Amino acid sequence: MTQTRIVPVILSGGSGTRLWPVSRESFPKQLWALVSDRTMIQETALRANGPAFAAPIVVCNQEHRFLIAEQLRNAGIVGARIVLEPVGRNSAPAIAAAAVLVAEEDPDAVLWMMAADAAIADVPALLTALDSAVVAARHGRIVTFGMRPTAPETGYGYIEQGPELAEAPGVHAVARFREKPDAAAAASFVADGRHLWNSGMFVFTARTLMEELDAHAPDVLPAVRLSVAERTADLDFIRLGVEAFSACPSISLDYAVAERTHRAAVVPADIGWSDVGSWSALWELGAKDAAGNVTLGDVVLESAENCYVRTDGQLTAVVGLKDTVLVVTEDAVLAMHRDMAQDVKKIVDRLKAAGRPEATAHKRVHRP
């Protein structure tokens, strides 16, 4: 049966350690409402919910399966297939499993791969860009979304765009992928107008992805095919074969395929995208008062400027601080300069090394 509708594939395997102490492995950031009154995974699923889309496939680890199923139901998402990874193997095996499942029905179906935890301000612009990406995907391209940079960000990878594709107006060949740059290189990328932030969203047909995995990462697909063949049904969940999936290399789709294939393309998009990868990113996204402060919860400020203050319970008062992040949870407090937001992971690593339960779990266990 030919699948004319786009199949959303939502990857929900991250732990979001840079948003500790709110995001932890047991309840990561995609399960929290951080930028709206819906959780991140609900917002992601709702962007791809309508007549143009098939029911989503969500790939996650088994510990989160009931929480994700409940959140999707509460958002009105019907018929989602939730695929359980027995172990984390990064994005290439995860999306390959979804592609193999879809290819059983229609190898030429178009898949839209996206992370569960990104924020997008302009959904209509996103869907317009998606239309262009689908045209290129149906011509055998692996299409990513490139975000026009608004600042010389060193925390993102960049894509250098090449010429526009004749068969897909608005979509460009990829000249090259670039690793996260230093500050000087990032500034030059922004200035030249040819470079885009790599969003990590991709559009391709199941057939194209599997062909490119075979060509560029031949260890991935055989193990994934076997794990899908050995799958079992568990309530509404799909459990992949443990031994076969565990044999997959741990590799991202960028490294496995996107940076190696000659079929890579990019659609430039101005959609207000953020990977919400740090507390400073949440400050940038948040509604600010006249002094540039973002507050959530029971917060009182005096002479504070450009701060992000969040409390999940107790009254939190801040006096005279600038450019500070203060996050208060039931069992942990994080205080830091906003410019150090990428270093939160170092704290989590130290807590793990010390055997502290706060590194990975909340004091209160969340049950659906």
Question: Model-flagged regions — what are they?
Answer:
Residues R18, Q30, E43, R47, ...:
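Alpha-helical scaffold segments in soluble metabolic enzymes
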Residues G13, N61-Q62, P86, M114-A116, ...:
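Fold-independent oxyanion-binding glycine-rich loops
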Residues L111, R194, M201-F202, S274, ...:
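A residue-level structural signature of the nucleotidyltransferase/glycosyltransferase Rossmann-like core
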Residues M1-I10, T17-P28, A33-A125, D131, ...:
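Conserved N-terminal catalytic core of the sugar/cofactor nucleotidyltransferase
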Residues T2-R5, T208-P368:
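Left-handed beta-helix
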Residues G88-P93, A151-E153, A183-A185, W273-S274:
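A short acidic, often aromatic-flanked loop/helix-cap motif at beta-alpha or helix-coil junctions
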Residues V123-A247, A265:
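Conserved core of the sugar-phosphate nucleotidyltransferase
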